[in-house]
């Protein structure tokens, strides 16, 4: 895979690997195989969080397993590593107070067995903490060398703008990447009503990211396997025409449907007013090999327009 140089200077693969279930529902042996396959295929952008996967374990497993992997393989310097802070951990409360940010970065560094995080996300917004306190605390991590770049996840557009305006006015580090739920089936923002507003990218957010030259890392981009198994779609999802088009294109091109969905996202920046999108997903080694075929697929202008207008 050819690498992309992001506006913040990070050089990443065009798709990111999610480590959400590593160490919990995905065993150490399986996770190592996935990581080896992803890196062998040219990937270098690995995403985790300090609370993965609390719904299946304690929430420490993913970072801990990744730290062991980097130790065993000796390849930490070969990857761009992203993790997050903000949700409740071990009853210490959700939030982005400076004490929480400072505590959890050290915990993440320890578990990941690294001296720095390439991309550190605010995993969720904290409306109860002054935005100045949040951005100054993150900036201190950058100045100390613990973090290279900052990102925001699950932020409303106006709050992302407020955070970066505050940082800019004070000479602090700004958010340079947004991570948000986004998929071809959810591309208009109104077709996944089971999710709350701030979890889905809408037109306003896409335009803001384009105007600010901020890439979008799209989580849940393969809808938990729904492109291959439509029973995984929410009952009230109204994206049937798009699903049918994806399957038609997949059959014509000899690809699996998820590869077409990935191609849509990696080609999306070619449309007027659309930001660069980096799909983020978890997969088995076999699924990785199939899905990543979409990265090298260049959609024609006509195909992009057809997909957009369906």
Question: PLM ranges: what are they?
Answer:
Residues 1-77, 143, 221:
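N-terminal binding-site loop/beta-alpha segment at the start of enzyme catalytic domains
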Residues 109-130:
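Active-site groove signature of glycoside hydrolases
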Residues 6-25, 79-92, 116, 121, ...:
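N-terminal small/glycine-rich loop or linker at the start of catalytic domains
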Residues 17, 48, 83, 119-122, ...:
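Conserved beta-strand positions
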Residues 23-29, 49-62, 88-91, 125-130, ...:
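Acidic-and-aromatic substrate-binding clefts and catalytic sites of carbohydrate-active enzymes
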Residues 26-38, 96-112, 161-165:
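Short, acidic/polar
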Residues 7-8, 39-40, 67-80, 109-113, ...:
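Acidic (Asp/Glu)-rich catalytic clusters
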Residues 129-310:
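Beta/alpha (TIM)-barrel catalytic core signal, keyed to glycine-rich beta->alpha loops juxtaposed to Asp/Glu
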């Amino acid at each position: 895979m050819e690498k992309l140089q992001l506006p913040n200077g990070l050089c990443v693969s065009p798709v990111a690997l999610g480590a959400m279930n590593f160490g919990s529902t995905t065993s150490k042996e399986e996770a190592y195989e996935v990581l080896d396959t992803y890196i062998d295929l040219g990937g270098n952008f690995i995403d985790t969080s300090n609370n993965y996967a609390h719904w299946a374990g304690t929430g420490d497993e993913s970072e801990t397993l990744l730290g062991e992997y980097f130790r065993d393989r000796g390849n930490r310097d070969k990857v761009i590593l992203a993790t997050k802070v903000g949700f409740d951990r071990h009853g210490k409360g959700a939030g982005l107070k400076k004490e929480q940010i400072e505590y959890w970065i050290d915990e993440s560094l320890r578990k990941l067995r690294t001296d720095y995080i390439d991309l550190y996300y605010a995993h969720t917004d904290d409306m109860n903490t002054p935005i100045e306190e949040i951005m100054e605390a993150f900036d201190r991590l950058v100045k100390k060398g613990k973090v290279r770049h900052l990102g925001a996840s699950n932020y409303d557009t106006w709050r992302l703008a407020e955070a970066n305006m505050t940082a800019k006015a004070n000479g602090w580090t700004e958010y340079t990447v947004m991570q948000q739920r986004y998929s071809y089936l959810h591309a208009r923002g109104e077709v996944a009503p089971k999710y709350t507003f701030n979890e889905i990218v809408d037109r306003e957010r896409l335009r803001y990211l384009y105007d600010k030259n901020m890439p979008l890392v799209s989580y849940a981009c393969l809808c938990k396997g729904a492109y291959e198994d439509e029973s995984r779609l929410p009952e009230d999802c109204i994206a049937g025409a798009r699903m049918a088009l994806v399957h038609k294109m997949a059959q014509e091109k000899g690809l699996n449907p998820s590869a077409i969905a990935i191609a849509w996202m990696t080609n999306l920046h070619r449309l007027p007013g659309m930001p660069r999108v980096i799909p983020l997903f978890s997969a088995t080694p076999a699924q990785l090999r199939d899905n990543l075929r979409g990265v090298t697929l260049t959609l024609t202008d006509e195909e992009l327009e057809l997909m957009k207008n369906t």
